[in-house]
Amino acid sequence: MAQENAAFSPGQEEPPRRRGRQRYVEKDGRCNVQQGNVRETYRYLTDLFTTLVDLQWRLSLLFFVLAYALTWLFFGAIWWLIAYGRGDLEHLEDTAWTPCVNNLNGFVAAFLFSIETETTIGYGHRVITDQCPEGIVLLLLQAILGSMVNAFMVGCMFVKISQPNKRAATLVFSSHAVVSLRDGRLCLMFRVGDLRSSHIVEASIRAKLIRSRQTLEGEFIPLHQTDLSVGFDTGDDRLFLVSPLVISHEIDAASPFWEASRRALERDDFEIVVILEGMVEATGMTCQARSSYLVDEVLWGHRFTSVLTLEDGFYEVDYASFHETFEVPTPSCSARELAEAAARLDAHLYWSIPSRLDEKVEEEGAGEGAGGEAGADKEQNGCLPPPESESKV
């Protein structure tokens, strides 16, 4: 009977509760790390484009509005200063006077003229004249700088909108990882799936074990990262993620769980971070989805429930059972102990089979007696009969 996310087998004593480990990576993929005491903040300004893209949406929109409003105000103030310096504001009623900008009678009019110039929406009755060289230079500068502001801000907003972060939200990981036998070997497994019909191209999976360790010299490393092989050597880490897949890490001699039994694993303190990467089929941009598993989320002796069924002409995926597991017979010893036991069993079988064959030969030979020459020419238990003797004349 299927059981969903059961942590222990019936009748088995639950290990003592430990203090909850602080996650390094949240289940939704957010890294639980905050940068503190960063004194060289000028480095953020050297890469202003990335800084603006990484801002929250409300701050990005605020910067977007301020960028345009400030440039309009800045150039509007300069247009007003030119008109004030040339005396245009004092000759508003003088028809013989040629101003720098026609019908510019105050700061508000200068501000509106600045907006019309930078946005190139066309002029109304405010038009620059050819009697104002400083105005012509300012017009060129505002046109060039306005184009630069447009390119920069529109580029930032486009990149921010087209970021594949939301695409990663439709890449799901199983809520638990499991440990069970696969082809006679202990394996750590978890499941990944894609909720969208458009696929992830060149998808690849990685897994890292994060736990504290102490070196031989006494150095304490609080978040040491160790790679967990999920098929890099065989190419199994490259996924064709059309339907949910179970990713397997074989616990062999190169695995950090080689000597971990069920009891030792439940008492350990670690975090397994899984990273799924690929390109979004629609945009070609790289997408990365992350999740993690703590010790309490690793179920020993469980296997994932199948979610794929064959219907009339197509395969159907039932995501209602995506996170479900069920218990299977699994030894509680470590992978090393299991391999040693299998080696001893193989050695015992290797030496016991010839001895049993010899015993069978002796029993059959004693039953036939000395007069059983007819059966002497037959093969017995894989042994060839002796060659025939020469006939006597």
UniProtKB/Swiss-Prot annotation:
Residues 83-106, 126-134 are extracellular. GO terms for biological process: potassium ion import across plasma membrane; regulation of monoatomic ion transmembrane transport; regulation of presynaptic membrane potential. A motif (PDZ-binding) lies at residues 390-393. It comes from the Eukaryota. The record marks N150 as: Role in the control of polyamine-mediated channel gating and in the blocking by intracellular magnesium. The chain crosses the membrane at residues 58-82, 135-156. Pfam families: IRK (PF01007), IRK_C (PF17655). It is a multi-pass membrane protein. It is found in: Membrane. Residues 1-23, 360-393 are annotated as: Disordered. Residues 384-393 have a biased composition (Pro residues). Residues 107-118, 119-125 dip into the membrane without crossing it. InterPro entries: Ig_E-set, IRK_C, K_chnl_inward-rec_Kir, K_chnl_inward-rec_Kir3.3, K_chnl_inward-rec_Kir_cyto, Kir_TM. Keywords: Ion channel, Ion transport, Membrane, Potassium, Potassium transport, Transmembrane, Transmembrane helix, Transport, Voltage-gated channel. Its main location: membrane. It catalyses: K(+)(in) = K(+)(out). GO terms for cellular component: inward rectifier potassium channel complex; parallel fiber to Purkinje cell synapse; plasma membrane; presynaptic membrane. A motif (Selectivity filter) lies at residues 120-125. Residues 1-57, 157-393 are cytoplasmic. GO terms for molecular function: G-protein activated inward rectifier potassium channel activity; inward rectifier potassium channel activity. PANTHER family: G PROTEIN-ACTIVATED INWARD RECTIFIER POTASSIUM CHANNEL 3, INWARD RECTIFIER POTASSIUM CHANNEL. Belongs to the inward rectifier-type potassium channel (TC 1.A.2.1) family. KCNJ9 subfamily. Inward rectifier potassium channels are characterized by a greater tendency to allow potassium to flow into the cell rather than out of it. Their voltage dependence is regulated by the concentration of extracellular potassium; as external potassium is raised, the voltage range of the channel opening shifts to more positive voltages. The inward rectification is mainly due to the blockage of outward current by internal magnesium, This receptor is controlled by G proteins. Unable to produce channel activity when expressed alone. Forms a functional channel in association with KCNJ3/GIRK1. Associates with KCNJ3/GIRK1 to form a G-protein-activated heteromultimer pore-forming unit. Interacts (via PDZ-binding motif) with SNX27 (via PDZ domain); the interaction is required when endocytosed to prevent degradation in lysosomes and promote recycling to the plasma membrane. The PDZ-binding motif specifically binds the PDZ domain of SNX27: the specificity for SNX27 is provided by the 2 residues located upstream (Glu-388 and Ser-389) of the PDZ-binding motif. This is G protein-activated inward rectifier potassium channel 3. It comes from Homo sapiens (Human). The gene is KCNJ9.
